[in-house]
């Protein structure tokens, strides 16, 4: 997900997306531990998406003040 797409979301939608990505990350880590993960690059993508969402949320929070 690109930062441009994330910025278009509302705060509630961003928090929901973050929750979804965290769940996906948990499942991917579990698959990796059991040797079932085929697309290891997905781990990195999900981590970076979570970081993007957190960054934009903190930017919005700072701009309010």
UniProtKB/Swiss-Prot annotation:
UniProt cross-references to InterPro entries, sorted A to Z: Ribosomal_protein_uL29, Ribosomal_uL29, Ribosomal_uL29_CS, Ribosomal_uL29_sf
Superkingdom to which the source organism belongs: Bacteria
A Pfam family assignment: Ribosomal_L29
Keyword Protein transport belongs to the record: no
Keywords for this protein: Ribonucleoprotein, Ribosomal protein
Biological process (GO), any one: translation
Any Gene Ontology CC annotation: cytosolic large ribosomal subunit
Molecular function terms from GO: structural constituent of ribosome
PANTHER family recorded: 60S RIBOSOMAL PROTEIN L35/50S RIBOSOMAL PROTEIN L29 (PTHR10916), LARGE RIBOSOMAL SUBUNIT PROTEIN UL29C (PTHR10916:SF0)
Similarity comment: Belongs to the universal ribosomal protein uL29 family.
Name this protein carries in UniProt: Large ribosomal subunit protein uL29
Species for this entry: Lactobacillus johnsonii (strain CNCM I-12250 / La1 / NCC 533)
Gene: rpmC
């Amino acid at each position: 997900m690109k930062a441009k797409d994330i910025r278009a979301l509302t705060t509630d939608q961003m928090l929901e997306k973050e929750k979804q990505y965290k769940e996906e990350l948990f499942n991917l880590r579990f698959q990796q531990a059991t040797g079932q993960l085929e697309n290891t690059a997905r781990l990195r993508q999900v981590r970076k998406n979570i970081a993007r969402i957190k960054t934009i949320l903190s930017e919005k929070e700072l701009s309010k003040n």
